[in-house]
Amino acid sequence: MLSGRCLATLALLALGAMAVPAHAATIQIVMENLVISPAEESAKVGDTIEWVNKDVFAHTATAKNGDFDVTIAPKKTVKSVLTKAGTVDYYCRYHPNMKAVLTIAP
């Protein structure tokens, strides 16, 4: 039979194992010379995307399914947090040949 001290230690270890949070990542996606880089990226719900526009004109990151629509001013960075899992095709509304895919895990 386990002692009270041993049971308390086991309970604390079990709670500690459950309380370890997953760390959200910050992922940088760059728009430069009319190209989105990387063209394919993986992330998780809760991660932050840093949309970096290095061009001298505005761009957007517009999800084809409507999940997000971010406008990034020239030479600026915009951050957004991912809230929904799925594979999202997105593009720049101003420059429709700029396309990429973001795969978001739960």
Place the predicted regions along the sequence by residue.
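Extracytoplasmic copper-binding redox domains, predominantly the cupredoxin/blue-copper superfamily
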Residues: 2-4, 13-14, 19-106
